[in-house]
């Protein structure tokens, strides 16, 4: 009888067996990857070898929190649920990469998919390609981040190559989330604005506040990694199944650190073909 119990990070035993069968570094071993051909070649050119496709999953029941009809407010219970579910998926993906002895994970995709197990049930999935550096970073040390974990990055293979060539390295994906209830307008305000071009300040302030909260939380994660900055930031809004007045604002990007003082890359040169 096979053991199907997950390990301490929640990674299933079947996943650990799959990773063990890859045997990275041994003669005849294979790798798996969701990189395109161009991305794969550029990651190799940057000095990293793909060693395996890694993923993390969390099927999460998101609880209920009701916002006041006429008040702009963060729904902290829902914010915490969305953050924790994504964090579980990311942690399990990182655990798979660590089991392979990877230095990092590139091309990470983090998605949310509604499931039919219930109205408030969703699967949070993190997937990417684990890689290992051919050599230590310039100046020595490790490609892993200051927490000793494999770095994570949602940059494409092309952007990853450019980042490394320019003298930077990824530290980790950083994110911030805020689920916000946007107040309903009073009937008098609705009628007073009929036929007018006018800013609805109540809505403007709600969306502004929610995005700022998400951005601030992402920046705090980057500071915890001692990053110099965050690149490739995406700021998205998702209604999920909460209705039109409750929205999740989600900010995500890749925290980076410098590898050297010089951050210039070679300028492209023009090549004139002698073929007819």
What function would you assign to each model-found segment?
Residues 198-201, 220-229, 233-264:
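C-terminal functional regions that serve as terminal interaction/effector modules
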Residues 1-78, 121-203, 254-276:
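Intrinsic disorder/low-complexity detector
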Residues 104-116, 229-242, 263-272:
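Short, conserved loop-to-beta-strand elements that form functional interface hotspots
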Residues 89, 172-179, 214, 234-238:
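Short flexible/disordered coil segments
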Residues 54, 59, 68-109, 188-234:
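Short, well-ordered alpha-helical segments
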Residues 85-139:
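Hydrophobic, ordered structural segments
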